[in-house]
């Protein structure tokens, strides 16, 4: 689907712009057939692998009602990295939920948060 001259799809998420590069990735929300639906999160890319997968770590605050205190928690989410995006480990990224791509991958990176 990543032919030259093809229009880039609008993902419909505010604050996310389409990449300037094109790709032929089937699981790209801009040039492929993958639709983004569900929740949109922000996190830090802590691991990027060669087969276009990565791990995003997200920190959030949880309120413990028994002790009336807040605590910091972390969650790690496995994501797909489209080949048209230039991301590296340590980048703050915006991810969106999609249909399951693999056994543990249901999110895709939409862009780098500046």
UniProtKB/Swiss-Prot annotation:
Signal peptide: none
Gene Ontology molecular function: rRNA binding; structural constituent of ribosome
Record-level GO cellular component terms: cytosolic small ribosomal subunit
Keyword Transmembrane: no
One Pfam entry name: Ribosomal_S17
Keyword tags: Ribonucleoprotein, Ribosomal protein, RNA-binding, rRNA-binding
Functional note: One of the primary rRNA binding proteins, it binds specifically to the 5'-end of 16S ribosomal RNA.
Subunit organization: Part of the 30S ribosomal subunit.
Family in the record: Belongs to the universal ribosomal protein uS17 family.
Protein name: Small ribosomal subunit protein uS17
Gene name linked to the record: rps17
